[in-house]
């Protein structure tokens, strides 16, 4: 199992998400199931080095992503829970969470999971909004990041090698993902996470 975080969650939502993933990782480890907890954001608010390089090159049209990505491994699959639990404190660190480029983060998480030797692989996405990066969207079509996300989801679901599940917090993720659950209250997250995993394992049996 692998959890993927989203940039926009702040305050209570990100705190609850961190606690839920911490408990889930500990529980799965006791069941001898390996898990990863991953996160993603950008290094800067206004594009960083990517945008500066684009400007120096004369601002060519349709440049694609114009921000520097930051992908974070809070817990790797082979790292024991006790060694990784302190890393989740990074989620609460002021200033670390900025913009969010969902598609490339999902592709990164998928690629990490695809290299694993386990027979059963589940990728869980926790999301609270559509992809947003002002630097990128200001010089590309308005649906650029959303289209990228849809394309990557489509590729993953078509391959059917990894089970992809999305949980939306106040955000309808069913318009992106085939297997999706939307909750309106972040306090429901822990229960929904466990229910989704239980249902998935039950179907396997």
Predicted regions and their residues:
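Acidic, glycine-rich A-domain
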Residues: 6-205
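Short, small-residue-biased leader/transition segments that mark boundaries at the very start
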Residues: 1-5
